[in-house]
A protein has these predicted regions:
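Short acidic, glycine-rich loop/turn motifs
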Residues: 7-11, 42-44
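Short, structured coil/loop segments at alpha-helix boundaries
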Residues: 11, 28, 50-52
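SH3-family beta-barrel domains
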Residues: 1-9, 29-33, 59-60
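Short aromatic-glycine-enriched beta-strand elements
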Residues: 33-39
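Short, surface-exposed secondary-structure edge patches
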Residues: 12-16
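Intrinsically disordered, low-complexity, charged/polar segments
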Residues: 39-61
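Conserved beta-strand/loop element in small beta-rich adapter and peptidoglycan-binding domains
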Residues: 17-28
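Intrinsic disorder/low-complexity segments
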Residues: 2, 24, 37, 47-50
């Protein structure tokens, strides 16, 4: 899935991912209680973990 970040995010290595960057979701983890976390990667290869409130997806069927 591809999406766009909805706010600035800092990953675990201190690298800032800016609002509006295009990202791809590589992996989804079920945290329970209807909550999920994803491993995302930017177009420049920066990886970060985030819940899905920080990324907007345009999913088409």
């Amino acid at each position: 899935m591809y999406g766009i970040t909805t706010k600035n995010i800092t990953n675990a290595n201190g690298i800032k991912i800016l609002k509006g960057e295009k990202v791809q979701c590589l992996f989804v983890t079920d945290l329970g209680s209807n909550k999920y976390e994803g491993l995302f990667v930017t177009e420049t290869g920066v990886k970060f973990l985030s819940d899905f409130s920080n990324v907007l997806f345009n999913i088409k069927r």
